[in-house]
């Protein structure tokens, strides 16, 4: 324990629940940076086919530092939809979708982007911008994401435990690209969905992992459902390796 972790500020009764540099996983921009680095490493050492294992997330850039790189990619895909997220916020705060570069120009004029002329002032808030998935898999016509918890007990050797009781979070409103500014359609954060005018607190907007697997098995069969969850486990390993 003492050889592996920083312990200068730990008292006798304290226990650790974070590894050193855990933010390399929990900060959105650092996670993307590390996955891009892993992809380059795999391509160099094992070839393009092996590197394709990292192609599970859409094109993503850090703003403002990669703004000009993003603009080049945006112009290569006219009419596409993108999603902006602050790197260190939760509950859907600060997230928005856009289709026109002008919307980013307006954002740049906001206080979040303004560079600090005074070194004593805080630096502009960092965002990630990702290509929005315009044809997501829907259940009941609604978007959802899956929240799975992993307990990492060791990195050398790597030991990871997957918590079985994860859950899927659903949007409250049926999916449509007609109104990309409607967070009740496009975001699955419970903090946002529970404020929807027609939100039903008894029904909620969550399924357990077991409910999700049962639905997918009934819809697509046991083999394909098992393949999906095995692929998810592979993604977990890539993210933490």
Question: Residue spans of the language-model regions?
Answer:
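Conserved N-proximal alpha/beta basic substrate-recognition cap immediately N-terminal to
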Residues: 1-83, 87-90, 97-110
């Amino acid at each position: 324990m003492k050889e592996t972790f920083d312990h200068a500020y730990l008292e006798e009764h304290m226990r650790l629940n974070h590894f050193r540099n855990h933010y390399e996983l929990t900060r959105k921009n650092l996670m993307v940076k590390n996955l891009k680095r892993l992809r380059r490493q795999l391509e160099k050492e094992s070839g393009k086919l092996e590197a394709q294992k990292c192609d599970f997330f859409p094109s993503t850039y850090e703003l403002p530092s990669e703004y000009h790189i993003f603009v080049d990619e945006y112009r290569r895909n006219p009419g596409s939809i993108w999603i902006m997220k602050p790197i260190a916020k939760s509950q859907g705060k600060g997230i928005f979708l856009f289709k026109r570069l002008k919307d980013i120009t307006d954002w740049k004029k906001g206080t979040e982007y303004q560079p600090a002329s005074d070194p004593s002032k805080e630096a502009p808030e960092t965002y990630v911008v990702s290509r929005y998935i315009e044809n997501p898999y829907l259940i009941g016509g609604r978007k959802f994401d899956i929240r799975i918890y992993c307990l990492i007990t060791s990195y050398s050797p790597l030991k990871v435990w997957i918590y079985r009781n994860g859950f899927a979070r659903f949007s409250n409103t049926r999916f449509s690209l007609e109104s990309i500014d409607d967070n009740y359609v496009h975001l699955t954060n419970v903090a946002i969905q529970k404020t929807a005018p027609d939100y039903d607190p008894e029904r909620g907007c969550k399924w357990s992992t077991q409910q999700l697997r049962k639905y997918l098995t009934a819809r697509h069969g046991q083999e394909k459902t098992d393949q999906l969850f095995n692929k998810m486990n592979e993604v977990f390993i890539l993210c933490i390796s």
